[in-house]
Amino acid sequence: MPIAQLYILEGRSDEQKETLIREVSEAMSRSLDAPIERVRVIITEMPKNHFGIGGEPASKLNR
């Protein structure tokens, strides 16, 4: 059972997350020759002040 664990910054819509799950699942199924029903995708949303880019919190960088 292939599992993808994705970390993204908070703020994406449910529709965007659904698209991400679908497209990652399709890519994993295709590239690993695994039935899509066996693919799992876990999304962890992080607050922008819990993620750093270039030594600064993403919240300060307007990301």
Curated annotation (Swiss-Prot):
Keywords: Aromatic hydrocarbons catabolism, Isomerase, Plasmid. GO terms for biological process: salicylic acid catabolic process. Pfam families: Tautomerase (PF01361). CDD domains: 4Oxalocrotonate_Tautomerase. InterPro entries: 4-OT, 4-OT-like_dom, Tautomerase/MIF_sf. Its EC number is 5.3.2.6. SUPFAM superfamilies: Tautomerase/MIF. GO terms for molecular function: isomerase activity. It catalyses: (2Z,4E)-2-hydroxyhexa-2,4-dienedioate = (3E)-2-oxohex-3-enedioate. Pathway: Aromatic compound metabolism; salicylate degradation. The active site is at P2. Belongs to the 4-oxalocrotonate tautomerase family. Homohexamer. NCBIfam families: PRK02220.1, taut. Catalyzes the ketonization of 2-hydroxymuconate stereoselectively to yield 2-oxo-3-hexenedioate. This is 2-hydroxymuconate tautomerase. The lineage of its organism: Bacteria, Pseudomonadati, Pseudomonadota, Gammaproteobacteria, Pseudomonadales. The gene is nahJ.
